């Protein structure tokens, strides 16, 4: 029977594993997109002597690239969303196990945790669709990538670049080394702590429904951990103390929309809030009972 600490560690490890797994999927889809673009170039752009011709006809055809990206976008969205929902489901399961160790039954909270967590990040569990204007819709959108690719093709046409040279150069720019491709950079920049935030949100829904007042700032420290996290890791905090973080200024804090209960240490924070009962909180932090007595 895993202990509460074991389940905290599992949630943290699963969040890390989820991020790496989805990153691999994004890189694979990036290779698919590269193939689609190069196939389109071969079939649609006129060349002469192996060089791309600088003609109004070629420049006008570049618009067709957007249709290629629109079709790819649907495949990308469905595949990556499937991965996110799968890993989110595992995190929901671990959160349910975690709260099953409490005296209060968590069964009735499980569905609400899934629904409210995914809703917060832009997915409607009732319709199975992305919420317009939500975080997921922005995360899965690669319209700016399509514009950049079209710009590169326009430059190649203007320079009458050899098609083979462009394909090689484009591969270096679009795919690049692992983690450095266009789609990968967009994904990593905007989703670095996605699964950590999903876990924090689910844990908070349970805490709200079960009336829990204290949380452990869970996780480990890395070489690049910021002072905010170094000061708080593995310590217990009450809701009022956590809410007060919104009034602080610290490295990594988003300038707009910071929610201390979900964002913790801000951009790229890998720590979690693990909510505990008052009894456990008082055991881990004896001054809590003293504070209550003084109120």
Regions found by a protein language model. Name each.
Residues 180-286, 290:
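Acidic, glycine-rich two-metal-ion catalytic cores of nucleic acid-processing enzymes
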Residues 1-179, 276-295:
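N-terminal leader/targeting and assembly helices and adjacent pre-domain segments
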